[in-house]
Amino acid sequence: MASVSATMISTSFMPRKPAVTSLKPIPNVGEALFGLKSANGGKVTCMASYKVKLITPDGPIEFDCPDNVYILDQAEEAGHDLPYSCRAGSCSSCAGKIAGGAVDQTDGNFLDDDQLEEGWVLTCVAYPQSDVTIETHKEAELVG
């Protein structure tokens, strides 16, 4: 007779608890508390928020701006009036000059490569990529 010297145990039939992938089950906790946003399906993504300082003719203003919101839109949301026209990066009404920091303005098409290198920015199509300082109301200087 043959003897069995080892016994194998399979655990594939044992149920596993799914990993937590959403903050929804936690009561009274919003995604904004953690700098997170939740898309449909419960997937959680991380978004950064940066300090934006705008130097206007009326004095400096500061606010926080998420990296997926245009600077002009967030400034208006914070109650500040800035010049604009097209809101599509196709004109120079919202032109400014970057004094420090970085933005992503790949959605715009008005500024050429030389102007971008010189620090010109269109706030209507600029996402902050770091804490940033921008001198606003510069359309006349840009086109003049």
Curated annotation (Swiss-Prot):
- Top-rank lineage group of the source organism: Eukaryota
Q: Tell me where in this chain the 2Fe-2S ferredoxin-type domain is found.
A: 50-140
Return the SUPFAM superfamilies for the record. Answer: 2Fe-2S ferredoxin-like
Places the protein is found = Plastid, Chloroplast
What keywords were assigned to this record?
2Fe-2S, Chloroplast, Electron transport, Iron, Iron-sulfur, Metal-binding, Phosphoprotein, Plastid, Transit peptide, Transport
What is the protein name given in its UniProt record?
Ferredoxin, chloroplastic
A GO CC term assigned to this protein in UniProt: chloroplast
Which gene underlies this protein?
AP1
List the GO biological process terms: electron transport chain; ferredoxin metabolic process
Annotated binding of [2Fe-2S] cluster, by residue:
C86, C91, C94, C124
Q: Which cofactor does it need?
A: [2Fe-2S] cluster
Q: Which residues carry this modification: Phosphothreonine?
A: T136
Q: What is the lineage of its organism?
A: Eukaryota, Viridiplantae, Streptophyta, Embryophyta, Tracheophyta
